[in-house]
Amino acid sequence: MIKLQNIKKEYRRKSIFESLDMTFEDKQLTILLGENGAGKSTLLRMISGLEDADRGNITYFGDQVAKKQLQDMIGYVPQDIALFEHMSVNENINCFKALCKNPITEDTIDQYASQLHLADRTVAVSKLSGGTKRKVNVLIGLLSNPQILILDEPTVGIDLKSRYDIHSLLNKMKAQCLIILTTHHLDEVEALADRIKVIGTDPFYRDVLKDKQWHFDTYNKQN
């Protein structure tokens, strides 16, 4: 479980969260919804240890964890594709794998690559389609065998087949780790979510989810 308590965060003197309390359960996939600027990416970066809260505590499985340890616990997949374009898929994998304390085995890499339909890993990233780059991005996030997997809009702007490949793998990964994901696609919510959390002040997502009779938790900057 990840537990956030009394989190305050400002960005450029603008309040994002005042006193946020939120929990994420292990072995579940939680989707964060909210308008642009609501703080979804900031929240993911705070949980990942990439940004500090101005106030409050975040605990992981009951403990406060140093940033160095978080690097070993968390697989973080940013919205921007974080790959070396001039290198092949395998070279990218080997480069990022070398940074992991306890990386997954080559057999597991092959298994994930197969599930993502990454057939030719000798191709330079620069020659890949946007959807294939996104799939490699997700695979890189799994190299450390993370207890927590965090994905910031991992399927934005890609084709339906690539989205399906990523969804299939994430649904299998739910049994192994805690997953947090942001998206703007309601079909992605339906395909993946065990829990739904809505942040921000725009009523759009709340109204749509109510119409669909889906259960969700709501948070605004005062929470």
For each feature predicted by the language model, list its residue ranges:
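Conserved structural motif at the start of ABC-family nucleotide-binding domains
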Residues: 2, 17-19
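The feature captures the beta-strand-to-loop junction immediately N-terminal to the Walker
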Residues: 33-35
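Helix-to-loop junction immediately C-terminal to a conserved catalytic motif
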Residues: 48
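Conserved ABC transporter NBD signature motif
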Residues: 56-70
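Conserved ABC ATPase "signature" region
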Residues: 94, 104-121
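Catalytic Walker B motif of ABC-type/P-loop ATPase nucleotide-binding domains
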Residues: 149-153
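Conserved H-loop
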Residues: 176-182
